C-alpha cells in the first residue's frame, strides 16, 4: 500500500474523501503566535452537516472563508455549526470557543451548540456566556430581532467509552498520550464508507496505533526535529513526553498504514517548513 503524506503549510486544506464527505483543515497552529497559521481546528462535512474537531483561535473566520457568502464554495454558513468536539483543554485548541458560541448565534443560529469534551469545557462555556451577558442581553432585549436559544449549549463529557452517533457519523473517543495531562483524547469518525482518525496532541500512543489501523485518513501531530534540537534540555524533556517526533511518526504510520497521513499541529520552533 502506498502511503500518501500531506504537509499542511497553508491555512486550510480540503480533501474530498467521498462525494458527500469532505475534510477541511482550518488551522494547523500551536501555542506559538504564527500569523500564518490559525489555532488547531478541523471541519468534517458529511452530507452538508458540519462537525468541528477542536476550535482554536480563528476557527469561525476560517470556516466562513469556505462558504459562498464569503467567496468560498460551501453552501452552508456559520449558523449550521452545532456539533463541536474537543480533544483536550489546552488553550491553543479552544481559544475560539467564544467565537463559536456567540458569532453563529448573531448570524441566526437557533439550535443549541452541542459540545463534546473533557471536564472543564462546560464551565468554560458557561463563563463565556456570563462574560458576554451584557452583549447577549442587548441583542435579545434591544431592537435587534435576535433569538433566545442559539447562544446556549448542551454538553456531554467524553471518556474512553464515549460514543456519539447520528444519521451521518459515529464518533468514538480514545485516550492518547499527552504527557501528564490525564484527560486528553483522540477521535475516530466513521461513516458507512470511511474512517478518519484524529490523534489530538500526543506522544506515541499504543492505543492510537490499535484503533487507527487501516484508517482512510490519519490526522496526526508532529514536531520539527531540527527545531527540537535547538530547545533547552528542560523543554526537550517536556516536548518528548507530550508530542511526536518525525521518526516516531514514521513508525506509527508504518504500523497503522492509513491511506492518507495528514500532518498537523506542526511545532517548528523557528525551523524551516521545508
Say what each PLM segment does.
Residues 186, 195, 203-274:
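Cap/insert and terminal regions of metallo-dependent hydrolase folds
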Residues 6-16:
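Bacterial N-terminal signal peptides
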Residues 19-197:
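Binuclear metal-dependent hydrolase catalytic cores
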Residues 11, 103, 128, 252-255:
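Alpha-helical structural signal in soluble globular domains
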Residues 1-5:
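Positively charged n-region of N-terminal signal peptides that target proteins for export
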